[in-house]
Amino acid sequence: KGVLDRAEFEARNDQFFADYKAGTLNIDEFLDFQLRPLRDNKRTQLAIWHNQFMAEVIRPNMKPSAIELVKHHQADNAVCVIITATNSFITQPIAQAFGIEALIATEPELVNGEYTGKVTGVPSFREGKVTRLNDWLAAKNWTLSSFESSHFYSDSINDLPLLECVSHPVAANPDHKLAEIAQTRGWPVLELFK
């Protein structure tokens, strides 16, 4: 939309993604980069752009296999939660599109109704996902052991701390490092996007 220098943005984003896949992402540097456009634009404009993003990019790429997986868990009366390092501005509408009410995401700070470019609370990344999940469960007077089983699907080695906490870890479209761990530990591997 001409708000960012496309070449610079893509180069930095590609480097952050490579670091993420390698398990070496500096979350603070990434969040400073990721949240800057929220800080630099009014929420009304951001909402317009996000609606376009949902219509043009997200909804056309929502794979039936992923939608069916969510529906399967919901049919079993599972409490479905999306837990993501991506900020809630981006992910809340995506969670809603999948019919999932509960979202644990990195929370961008709001002051006087506008984004500051900073984070509120613990980023939902690596061990932070475990912390944020435990806080969310505690607010409902639950723990993971309150449930007969717990499932977590991930594509990233960065999610190993949470995968190790649940009764049913699943590597979904895993990166190379996670695929190796899943094979070693006998975890199921799903290819949801083929």
Q: Positions of the model-derived regions?
A:
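A metal-dependent, Asp-based hydrolase signature
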Residues: 1-72
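C-terminal cap/substrate-recognition subdomain and adjoining C-terminal extension
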Residues: 48-51, 55-194
